[in-house]
């Protein structure tokens, strides 16, 4: 359909009078938002009959759109208000021209760098980097604030000072609560040292427990009845790296007073409310069946006290750690509950025995402290224990076996490295000996006499071949070797010189050759100047050719071409001569 050409202002009513409904819709799609909305929402009869007050009669400038087809497709979707607003928004986004209507907002053109912000966002990089620095600095500050010095830990009671003056030695109190509020791990077994302790409540941990004295449980209602341990939830975990184990003995008298025993008993009862109670005979069982399935061999009977000190703690720790590492992989199951009879309490370890007043006497109990790797900062250093007396829970044979196993574990990896690196040396060492090769008939068996005979045969062959060489006289007779005499050689040289000089003296000069006209080449009679008279510097008057020189050269060339130059008779007319 051909649209009428209008260069004047139109309103809604005049447009409907000129065009039908379809052409009016197409026309007003390119106009302002108000005109398009009125065209879409109102049927033609209503729009024609609408009152003049409802119609916006402000002039609208007609602007030609790029294409009408996509807008018609959008208009046919729906005739409700929401669809009309969506069509208006899409039309405004796709149009590059600004429609200066009162109800039409100006279209914001997209910059060519608009998509660059979606990909390249350096401000976010800076933010991420700063946040990362903040997190790391906060973590470092928190760790530094949590780390305390040795003096503060001694003041808090976590560590105890070591005195070497009067022979009194005290070790770190592992029963107190640690710095970060963590209790002892499942691998920490501790028999409480017989010293005054303050009952400190500890958080409930199913894997941490204390070992009480046998007399505490013997005071119960039925000392002869078997005591059952509650089932401990034990997780079968893969073998962990070996932990350092310290077995230290608190120094004290073999017999304690009733007051110290009562204080110890009250403190143990306060701690036992939050932990499992284990008998000393069960302590042996716990050492054999650890929380992770570890066998720790225990020594029966009272452990002897070493009077002058013990060996280096590192050796004991090393043997215990290697034993634990070896036995972790072998043990897979841990029994849930065990029962012991009261007879085992009296005869197993000899820890308690009846004393006067009917109260049991308490002997020294070794404290087994397994260092936990979780909280290394609050644990005293190993040199603090070097001078303290220790007790050994191993016999000499078991220690030797552990040391052998340790050495084999450490040397096996080294041996594998040596085997990998020195494979050539191993192959060379595996070479068969001479005797084996002789037995396999690879090398012939020879005695010393046979070797001497073989050498003599080779020598005779060489001498026979050397004797067959011709002598100098034979070579002279064959004219292969000429006899040399200095006088004769000098005479020959003189004769050669005389012959050459005679030939050179008989040579004709250039002038004689010119006169005889027997010059063969053009270069034979070219005069050569001496090096002293010749000057290679340019722009000298004697280096420039004059006109007469050039004419002489041209004449000489023409004569050469006409007389001396060999030219075929049929092509002689093609020879070019220089101007005279």
Curated annotation (Swiss-Prot):
Residue numbers bearing the Phosphothreonine modification: 104
Organismal lineage: Eukaryota, Metazoa, Chordata, Craniata, Vertebrata
Entry GO MF terms: actin binding; protein phosphatase inhibitor activity
Residue ranges, compositional bias (Basic and acidic residues): 374-383, 471-494
Region (Disordered): 330-350, 374-408, 463-494
Phosphoserine: residues carrying this PTM: 67, 78, 467, 505
Biased composition (Acidic residues): 395-407
Quaternary structure and interacting proteins, as annotated: Interacts (via RPEL repeats) with ACTA1 and PPP1CA; ACTA1 and PPP1CA compete for the same binding site.
GO cellular component annotations of the record: cytosol; nucleus; synapse
RPEL repeat ranges, renumbered to this chain: 138-163, 422-447, 460-485, 498-523
Protein name in UniProt: Phosphatase and actin regulator 1
Subcellular location(s) of the protein: Cytoplasm; Synapse; Nucleus
Function: Binds actin monomers (G actin) and plays a role in multiple processes including the regulation of actin cytoskeleton dynamics, actin stress fibers formation, cell motility and survival, formation of tubules by endothelial cells, and regulation of PPP1CA activity. Involved in the regulation of cortical neuron migration and dendrite arborization.
Effect of mutating residue 500 to P: Does not rescue cortical neuron migration defects in PHACTR1 knocked-down mice
Reported impact of residue 496 to A: Reduces affinity for actin
Motif interval(s): Nuclear localization signal: 108-129
Main subcellular location: cytoplasm
A Pfam match: RPEL
Family named by the database record: Belongs to the phosphatase and actin regulator family.
Keyword vocabulary terms for this entry: Actin-binding, Cytoplasm, Nucleus, Phosphoprotein, Protein phosphatase inhibitor, Repeat, Synapse
């Amino acid at each position: 359909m051909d649209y009428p050409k209008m260069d004047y202002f139109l309103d809604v009513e005049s447009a409907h009078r000129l065009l039908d409904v379809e052409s009016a819709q197409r026309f007003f799609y390119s106009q302002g938002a108000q005109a398009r909305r009125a065209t879409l929402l109102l049927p033609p009869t209503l729009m024609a009959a609408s009152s003049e007050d409802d119609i916006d009669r402000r002039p609208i400038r007609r602007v030609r759109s790029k294409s009408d087809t996509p807008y018609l497709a959008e208009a046919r979707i729906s005739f409700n208000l929401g669809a009309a607003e969506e069509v208006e928004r899409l039309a405004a986004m796709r149009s590059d021209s600004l429609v200066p209507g009162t109800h039409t907002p100006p279209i914001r053109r997209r910059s060519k760098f608009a998509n660059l912000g979606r990909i390249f966002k350096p401000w976010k990089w800076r933010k991420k980097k700063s946040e990362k620095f903040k997190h790391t600095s906060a973590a470092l500050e928190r760790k530094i604030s949590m780390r305390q010095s040795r003096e503060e830990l001694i003041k808090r009671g976590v560590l105890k000072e070591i005195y070497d003056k009067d022979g009194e030695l005290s070790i770190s109190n592992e029963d107190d609560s640690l710095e970060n509020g963590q209790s002892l791990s499942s691998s920490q077994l501790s028999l409480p040292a017989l010293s005054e302790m303050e009952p400190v409540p500890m958080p409930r941990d199913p894997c941490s427990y204390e070992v009480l004295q046998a007399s505490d449980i013997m005071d119960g209602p039925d000392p002869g009845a078997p005591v059952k341990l509650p089932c401990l939830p034990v997780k079968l975990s893969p073998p962990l790296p070996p932990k350092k184990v310290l077995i230290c003995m608190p120094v004290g008298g073999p017999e304690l007073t009733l007051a110290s025993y009562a204080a110890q008993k009250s403190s143990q009862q306060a701690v036992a409310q939050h932990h499992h109670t284990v008998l000393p005979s069960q302590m042996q069982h716990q050492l054999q069946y650890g929380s992770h399935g570890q066998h720790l061999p225990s020594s029966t009977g009272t452990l002897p006290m070493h009077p002058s000190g013990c060996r280096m703690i590192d050796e004991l720790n090393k043997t215990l750690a290697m034993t634990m590492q070896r036995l972790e992989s072998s043990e897979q199951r841990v029994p849930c509950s065990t029962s012991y009879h009261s007879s085992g309490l009296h005869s197993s370890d000899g820890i308690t025995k009846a004393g006067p007043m009917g109260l049991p006497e308490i002997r020294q109990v070794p404290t087994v402290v397994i260092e936990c790797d979780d909280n290394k900062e609050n644990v005293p250093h190993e040199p603090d224990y070097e001078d303290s007396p220790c007790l050994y829970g191993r016999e000499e044979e078991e220690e030797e076996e552990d040391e052998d196993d340790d050495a084999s574990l450490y040397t096996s990896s080294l041996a594998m490295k040596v085997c990998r690196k020195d494979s050539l040396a191993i192959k060379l060492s595996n070479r068969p000996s001479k005797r084996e090769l002789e037995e396999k008939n690879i090398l012939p068996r020879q005695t010393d006499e046979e070797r001497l005979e073989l050498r003599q045969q080779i020598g005779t062959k060489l001498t026979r071949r050397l004797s067959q060489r011709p002598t100098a006289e034979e070579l002279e007779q064959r004219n292969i070797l000429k006899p040399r005499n200095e006088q004769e050689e000098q005479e020959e040289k003189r004769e050669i010189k005389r012959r050459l000089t005679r030939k050179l003296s008989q040579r004709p000069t250039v002038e004689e050759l010119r006169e005889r006209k027997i010059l063969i080449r053009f270069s034979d009679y070219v005069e050569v100047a001496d090096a002293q008279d010749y000057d290679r510097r340019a722009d000298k008057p004697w280096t420039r050719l004059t006109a007469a020189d050039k004419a002489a050269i041209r004449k000489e060339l023409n004569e050469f071409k006409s007389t001396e130059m060999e030219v075929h008779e049929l092509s002689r007319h093609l020879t070019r001569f220089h101007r005279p």
